[in-house]
């Protein structure tokens, strides 16, 4: 099957934004204008095409990044047909894992900002993730029709808060109720969209006289940004020559792809203005798969051996599985991005991470929650596969004859956990299946059984995250469950070095005895270093074959520390000495000796409890600033700064222990009459004050 769209005309883009910047509405309009959707879905009615899980429709927030394919020939039909693969990403902090995961497979992104709210806390998180993966991006200022809308204030915030380098390629005509359209700085014409056709038709008009000076000033800035792309253009510009439209577009495109600038546009998706021009900007400025460096990977058996794959149909096949979803009709769907080569349904692919070959069953092209079966996928495509049993998020799929491991994604450790128990015996079995399915879909969600209580414990990135997963368990799997109170994921570590601590396991009870003896030194590591074991045994005082047993004994003890039974982190153990018995020594005895030595060393090394600290940002009207700050301080929070919001009001940034943040949304609502909002994400672990540590230990019954 021949390629319908040349790869140069592919655009793999993400639409991402803070909650309520209108991202889902913007995506809906894109689907409408590109002719896929014939009736626009409104988030207000719970009918938006991209928000396809029931909870999303009820809550009006986007949870799952649905992947959609659409086609665009330009708003005036003046471009050859381009193929957009659009990934809708969630804007809520509890779902940053989804955003991070989609950034990994995108070539470019459209960042949507609210013209009133401006750069909000989550926008900064998303921006950091886009920087991490080097994703070129456009900025689209939405909701220009709302009271308090201010395009130029958002421009200033992009520069100051995100350290971005925005280059407006349009400026608004009017704002709030008077927002009529935009001045296109490339054409130096006003664009006015026709309301009757929902913005499908438009016309170019002369720039309104009162805007001419503003348009001239911003065009000059845009041309100057373009001229900085190369010395030749700069000479031409400084010599007073006009740059052609094509030169400006190419120069801005080159600088956007190099992540030096971000073209900036505006509109109101809800009123059908401006999104069409943004789609043209996606063609003009964002990269195709061949405009960015080839994807990098490593050899399956040698991490030092670097490999790469070009975005070309004739290369060996390589793809990355970036999302797993359970679909009520076809079962498990694996979304994957093809970086190189091509593959047909029925072909065998190799998963080097799991070291398994699998047959690719059906391949589906997704449009939000509708699907079309296709036979072949090519370089640059994003599709979903049915029938891959072993693949999980972040796995590579490749040609069995040419293995490559594309980089692994690193997922954050969960910070909050809850006990969950089925309401009836019938729910028991279903709950196990449901939790395993959900954990396969979402690497930031973990399930385990508590050995002491026998309870099932679920852990995730925040209260909303777990709430939604429990909700899905009920809807998709019919499991009724009771949820315990949220528990904080504390950790334990040490502050001092404990030298030459011994563990001796001796058992003589008729017949063959047991004998293991290990001496260790335990010392703290810097935060985040994890556990390290060093074998410093000299002269064979412990035989080689027993040393792994000592390490295993220690590793098995790490999940339950001595203070309150929380996992021990960031410690280094050096095995320095020991002894053995020719007859009675065995692996089990040395495992016990290692465990005993470690527990004893922990007691001597000033053990402390660590608690998760959260970066909290509260957006509040100015009148409540004092109240909010006072409340954060009473929660042991440290206020770290304050910013102004575009439409008035303040953003308060603070670091607060997670244990103090339960029920915060209700408290904040009542303290500010529902006018303040907040976001929170995990920052780092810090030592808990003595009184808090004692309270936690008492609650755990381990004083």
Swiss-Prot record:
GO terms for molecular function: GTP binding; GTPase activity; guanosine tetraphosphate binding; translation elongation factor activity. It is found in: Cytoplasm. GTP binds at residues 17-24, 88-92, 142-145. One of its GO terms (cellular component) is cytoplasm. Residues 8-290 form the tr-type G domain. One of its GO terms (biological process) is ribosome disassembly. CDD domains: EF-G (cd01886), EFG_III (cd16262), EFG_mtEFG1_IV (cd01434), EFG_mtEFG_C (cd03713), EFG_mtEFG_II (cd04088). The keyword Nucleotide-binding applies. Pfam families: EFG_C, EFG_III, EFG_IV, GTP_EFTU, GTP_EFTU_D2. Keywords: Cytoplasm, Elongation factor, GTP-binding, Nucleotide-binding, Protein biosynthesis. NCBIfam families: EF-G, PRK12740.1-5, small_GTP. Catalyzes the GTP-dependent ribosomal translocation step during translation elongation. During this step, the ribosome changes from the pre-translocational (PRE) to the post-translocational (POST) state as the newly formed A-site-bound peptidyl-tRNA and P-site-bound deacylated tRNA move to the P and E sites, respectively. Catalyzes the coordinated movement of the two tRNA molecules, the mRNA and conformational changes in the ribosome. Belongs to the TRAFAC class translation factor GTPase superfamily. Classic translation factor GTPase family. EF-G/EF-2 subfamily. This is Elongation factor G 1.
């Amino acid at each position: 099957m021949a390629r319908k769209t040349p790869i140069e005309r592919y655009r793999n883009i993400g639409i991402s934004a803070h909650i309520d910047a209108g991202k889902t509405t913007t995506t809906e309009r894109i689907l409408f204008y590109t002719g896929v959707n014939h009736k626009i879905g409104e988030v207000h009615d719970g009918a938006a095409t991209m928000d396809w899980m029931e909870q999303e429709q009820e809550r009006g927030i986007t949870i799952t990044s649905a992947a959609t394919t659409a086609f665009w020939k330009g708003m005036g039909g003046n471009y050859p047909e381009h193929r957009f693969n659009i990934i809708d990403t969630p804007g809520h902090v509890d779902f940053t894992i989804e955003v991070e995961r989609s950034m990994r497979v995108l070539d470019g992104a459209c960042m949507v900002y609210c013209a009133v709210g401006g750069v909000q806390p989550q926008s900064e998180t998303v921006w950091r993730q886009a920087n991490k993966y080097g994703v070129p991006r456009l900025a689209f200022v939405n909701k220009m029709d709302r009271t308090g809308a201010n395009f130029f204030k958002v421009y200033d915030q992009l520069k100051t808060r995100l350290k971005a380098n925005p280059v407006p390629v349009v400026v608004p005509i009017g704002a709030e109720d008077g927002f009529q359209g935009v001045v296109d700085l490339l054409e130096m014409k006003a664009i006015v969209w026709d309301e009757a056709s929902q913005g499908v038709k438009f016309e170019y008009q002369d720039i309104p006289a009162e805007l001419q000076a503003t348009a001239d000033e911003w065009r000059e800035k845009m041309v100057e940004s373009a001229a900085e792309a190369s010395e030749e253009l700069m000479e031409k510009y400084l010599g007073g020559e006009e740059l052609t439209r094509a030169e400006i577009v190419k120069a801005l495109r080159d600088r956007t792809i190099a992540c030096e600038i971000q073209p900036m546009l505006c509109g109101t998706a809800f009123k059908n203005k401006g999104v069409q021009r943004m789609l043209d900007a996606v063609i003009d400025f964002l990269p195709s798969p061949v405009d960015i460096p080839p994807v990098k990977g490593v050899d399956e058996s040698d991490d030092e051996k670097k490999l790469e794959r070009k975005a070309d149909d004739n290369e060996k096949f390589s793809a990355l599985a970036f999302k797993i979803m359970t679909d009520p009709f076809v079962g498990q769907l694996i979304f994957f991005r093809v970086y190189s080569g091509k593959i047909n349904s029925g072909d065998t692919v190799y998963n080097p991470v799991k070291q398994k070959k699998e047959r690719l069953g059906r391949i589906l092209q997704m449009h939000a929650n509708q699907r079309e079966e296709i036979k072949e996928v090519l370089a640059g495509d994003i599709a979903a596969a049915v029938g891959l049993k072993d693949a999980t998020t972040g796995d590579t799929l490749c040609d069995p004859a040419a293995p490559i491991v594309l980089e692994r994604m690193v997922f954050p450790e969960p910070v909050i956990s809850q006990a969950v128990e089925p309401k009836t015996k019938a729910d028991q079995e279903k709950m196990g299946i449901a939790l395993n399915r959900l954990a396969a879909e979402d690497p930031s969600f973990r399930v385990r059984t508590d050995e002491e209580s026998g309870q099932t414990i679920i852990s995730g990135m925040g209260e909303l995250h777990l709430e939604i997963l429990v909700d899905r368990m009920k809807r998709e799997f019919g499991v009724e469950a009771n949820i315990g109170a949220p528990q904080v994921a504390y950790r334990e570590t040490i502050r001092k070095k404990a030298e030459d601590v011994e563990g001796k396991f001796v058992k003589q009870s008729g017949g063959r005895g047991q004998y293991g003896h290990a001496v260790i030194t335990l010392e703290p590591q810097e935060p985040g270093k994890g556990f390290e074991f060093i074998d410093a045994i000299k002269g064979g005082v412990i035989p080689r074959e027993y040393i792994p047993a000592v390490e295993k004994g220690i590793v098995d003890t790490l999940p339950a520390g001595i203070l309150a039974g929380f996992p021990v982190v960031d410690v280094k153990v050096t095995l320095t000495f020991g002894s053995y018995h020719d007859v009675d020594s065995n692996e089990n005895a040395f495992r016990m000796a290692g465990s005993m030595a470690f527990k004893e060393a922990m007691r001597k090394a000033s053990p402390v409890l660590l608690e998760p600290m959260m970066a909290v940002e509260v957006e509040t009207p100015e009148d409540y600033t004092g109240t909010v700050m006072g409340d954060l301080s009473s929660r042991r929070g440290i206020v770290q700064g304050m910013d102004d919001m575009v439409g008035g009001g303040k953003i308060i940034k603070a670091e607060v222990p997670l244990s103090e943040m339960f029920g915060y949304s209700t408290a904040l609502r009542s303290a500010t009459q529902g006018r303040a909002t907040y976001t929170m994400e995990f920052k780092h672990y810090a030592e808990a004050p003595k009184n808090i540590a004692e309270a936690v230990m008492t609650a755990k019954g381990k004083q």
